């Protein structure tokens, strides 16, 4: 049996079902490139020492070590931060395991999407989509975040922006994301990411961070650290505005 479990965005978010699976699994693996994971929690529950797998292990080598465990008739678990299949990072491994006759179960966890909207007090019913602010690839910045925010602003919808992870495993800090967004504005020139654009930043959710509501330009000198997510509001209702300003450590002027 192969389980993929989500342990939530930070310590204390693991579900009882995920904890029980860790207690019973023969092989426990985890990855920390899609999000920060609390390894101490894994060690506390797992009966065997957790093994870290890199992106290369899971993608380039198609989860070879997981499949080797399964081939010995043992139960394997792969733990991820947040909700394991909110993105499709591990869909290929599920397909491979099933094609070889292994049973697979996905155990959901608290996702960064739900947690960010809960922490920021914004309505998830107004979420118009999710994009990722990425570092340039080959010197080119992806326009996807710009285009999605532009579409959602026209419809009065919120946009959730995830932030990239560097090749060395360092999570993009909000100041880098703000710089990239402003560079996209310099290129596109349609008034989507100007310095005065109000954004909600949710840094280190569950690790002591609190949401910040402020103009995009003020993040250039920010010391907020990653991992973090941005929400670009598509227009705040009076209730949303009052709530986010009450919860936020910083407020737009």
Curated annotation (Swiss-Prot):
Catalysed conversion reaction: 2-[(3S)-amino-3-carboxypropyl]-L-histidyl-[translation elongation factor 2] + 3 S-adenosyl-L-methionine = diphthine-[translation elongation factor 2] + 3 S-adenosyl-L-homocysteine + 3 H(+)
Keyword S-adenosyl-L-methionine: yes
Pathway: Protein modification; peptidyl-diphthamide biosynthesis
The entry's keywords: Methyltransferase, S-adenosyl-L-methionine, Transferase
GO molecular function, one term: diphthine synthase activity
Domain of life according to the entry: Archaea
Keyword S-adenosyl-L-methionine applies: yes
EC number of the protein: 2.1.1.98
Binding positions for S-adenosyl-L-methionine per the UniProt entry: 83, 86, 111-112, 163, 205
InterPro entries: 4pyrrol_Mease, 4pyrrol_Methylase_sf, 4pyrrole_Mease_sub1, 4pyrrole_Mease_sub2, Dphthn_synthase
Pfam families in the record: TP_methylase
GO biological process: methylation; protein histidyl modification to diphthamide
Protein's job: S-adenosyl-L-methionine-dependent methyltransferase that catalyzes the trimethylation of the amino group of the modified target histidine residue in translation elongation factor 2 (EF-2), to form an intermediate called diphthine. The three successive methylation reactions represent the second step of diphthamide biosynthesis.
UniProt xrefs under HAMAP family: Diphthine_synth (MF_01084)
Similarity field: Belongs to the diphthine synthase family.
Subunit and interaction comment: Homodimer.
Name this polypeptide is given: Diphthine synthase
């Amino acid at each position: 049996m192969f389980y993929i479990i989500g342990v939530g965005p930070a310590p204390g978010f693991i579900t009882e079902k995920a904890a029980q699976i860790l207690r019973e699994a023969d092989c426990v693996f985890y990855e920390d490139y899609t999000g920060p994971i609390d390894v101490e929690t894994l060690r506390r529950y797992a009966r065997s020492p957790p093994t870290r797998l890199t992106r290369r292990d899971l993608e380039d080598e198609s989860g070879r070590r997981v499949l080797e465990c399964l081939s010995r008739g043992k139960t394997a678990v792969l733990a991820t931060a947040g909700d394991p299949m909110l993105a499709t990072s591990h869909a290929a491994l599920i397909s491979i395991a099933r094609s070889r006759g292994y049973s697979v179960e996905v155990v959901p966890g608290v996702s960064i999407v739900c947690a960010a909207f809960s922490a920021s007090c914004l309505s998830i019913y107004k979420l118009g989509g999710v994009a990722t602010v990425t570092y340039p690839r080959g010197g080119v910045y992806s326009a996807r975040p710009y285009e999605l925010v532009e579409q959602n602003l026209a419809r009065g919808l919120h946009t959730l922006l995830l932030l990239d992870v560097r090749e060395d495993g360092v999570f993009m800090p909000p100041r880098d994301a703000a710089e990239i967004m402003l560079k996209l504005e310099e290129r596109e020139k349609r008034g989507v990411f100007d310095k005065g654009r109000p954004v909600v930043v949710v840094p280190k959710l569950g690790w002591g961070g609190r949401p910040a509501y402020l103009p995009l330009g003020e993040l250039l000198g920010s010391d907020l650290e990653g991992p973090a997510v941005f929400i670009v509001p598509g227009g705040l209702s009076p209730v949303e505005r009052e709530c986010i300003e009450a919860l936020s450590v910083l407020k737009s002027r």
